[in-house]
Amino acid sequence: VRSFIADRTGGIPDPFTARPASRQITRAEAAAGVHIDAFRRTPLHDEHIALGARMDRFGGWWRPWHYGDHVAEYWSVREAVSLGDVSTLGKLIVSGPDAVEFLERLYPTNIADIRVGRSRYALLLNERGHLMDDGMICREAESRFVLTFTSAGASHAEMWVRDWVDTLGLRVHVLDRTMSLAAINVTGPLAGQLLERVGLSEQPRFLQHVRAEVAGVPCHVMRLSFTGEMSFELHHAVERSVELWRSLMAHGHDLGIAPHGLQALQALRLEKGNVIVGMDSELDSTPRRLGMEWAVKMDKPDFIGRSALARTAQLPDDRRLVGLTMPGMAPIEGSPIWFDHEVIGHVASSFTSPVLGHAVMLGWLKRAPFPEQVEVDGRSASVVRPPFYDPEGSRARA
């Protein structure tokens, strides 16, 4: 092609845009994964390897799936104390004179009544009222907020936030701290005792957050819970992450401390009925379909997706994410849900609960009225309202 063009034009001009050098890779390189590993690593990656972790790719990151025994990791959270690497969470700082007004438009929950030092869970919706992401809103000052997002959705959420800053023309500054801040989740009934040992004597209560030193490392300490147990997220500079991790592991040795991977976390969060965006949700999932109407304040004058939610609220309830329980082992995710000899949905997440001794699931039912008993994997399953474990939330608030 180059010769053909050169013969007829007298030469090929130099490229007018910069372009990095590239070449084809060999089959051996492709098989080995050379040059094609686009997944990021947290600053604790080598610590996980040293502890025997089986690493897997999830949400754009290499993350520990388990450390050899996911059931033992599960029990370390339920009965003692455990560490989880949550550095992969998206982290944005939104500040400026119009920060409150901007976030009121961005989120379907109330923002103005979040007090300084308090946090709130929030959904991120698009214009159609469909769930894009979720996370926490932490108010640090009257006009300064820290937002967190899911690991897989962080990049898109950042672009979404910046686009709406430009669209609304408000006086807001957005700073992405996803790669400059690491985070460790200290979770379990002995989490508070461990943190007291490493200098955090005045600990935030549930849904509060403080700036404090933990084991000599400056941290933004957020009290929340994805596991259903007492939990503290320690957000800190990436260069201090290994130091903090090792100190926590050393001080928690006699407490039975152990790290936990994603496989144990899957069981922990599922027992609490906590949704993972993109795993339990679908592209057109609304808060109503997810059973999360409580996270939407329709009495607000406006927010992204409000008009669409007002319209769809007038339509019949056509599908819903529900909890399911059944004796024995959990069926595989994606299993069809049967009722009256028809498939009426599928299992989104499933696990055999160690503490409950039976299968717990989140699944989609796509035919109203929704039955109370269905069949999954040839067995009877009950349709229930999650959470399955500690429905009052007393353990997380301890």
Descriptions of predicted regions:
Residues 97, 150-155, 189-191, 237-242, ...:
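Helix N-cap motif at beta-to-alpha junctions
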